[in-house]
């Protein structure tokens, strides 16, 4: 397998695309986002992060036959059996806003505020005529806090305080948050893999 020179990021979320591009900068890849290529995201109907990431990656790969990277992320609250998890974005959308989602989640928690963020990255590419699929998982633990605090980041970042910190992800400077959040953990694993390609 030779190193590939191009990569499609199967996401329309510009915040996510910028984060991924920054991590992959040392590899000098020509990176395009799904929206730049006018491609539509498929419905994510998997029951796990792995399934959803693969659904996105496989759909875009089938259209372009180029290396594709996709991810699925979620916010899980332990005492709510991992909810909202794989439906994190849809739950917030159904609530009308992330702030309202935070309020509803807070009303459902009594004493156990432990929470976690998870990202799974799927990479699909062709090697000597064979389609190769790789998965890279990143997780960080912490606590749900309400009301949310901070202006940086997006999604559930304002209501998540990583273990060992007294700031939410949204209160942290971008350069700090981007180095250790759940997506960064998964991206470092991806980068380690890319370095092994001859």
Regions found by a protein language model. Give the residues of each.
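Anionic-ligand binding patches
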Residues: 2-8, 15-198
């Amino acid at each position: 397998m030779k190193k590939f020179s191009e990569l499609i990021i199967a996401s329309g979320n510009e915040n996510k695309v910028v984060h991924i591009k920054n991590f992959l900068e040392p590899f000098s890849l020509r990176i395009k986002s799904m929206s730049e290529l006018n491609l539509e995201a498929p419905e994510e109907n998997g029951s796990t992060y792995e399934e959803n990431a693969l659904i996105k990656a496989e759909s875009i790969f089938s259209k372009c036959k180029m290396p594709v990277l996709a991810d699925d992320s979620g916010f899980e609250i332990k005492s709510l059996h991992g909810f909202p998890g794989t439906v994190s974005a849809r739950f917030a959308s159904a609530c009308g806003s992330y702030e309202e989602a935070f309020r509803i989640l807070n009303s459902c928690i009594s004493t156990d505020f432990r929470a976690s963020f998870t990202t799974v990255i799927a990479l699909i590419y062709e090697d000597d005529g064979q389609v190769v699929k790789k998965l890279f998982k990143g997780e960080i633990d912490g606590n749900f806090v309400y009301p949310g605090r901070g202006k940086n980041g997006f999604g559930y970042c304002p209501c998540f305080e990583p273990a060992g910190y007294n700031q939410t992800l949204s209160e942290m400077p971008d350069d700090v948050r981007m180095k250790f959040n759940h997506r960064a953990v998964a991206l470092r694993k991806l980068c380690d893999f890319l370095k092994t390609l001859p």
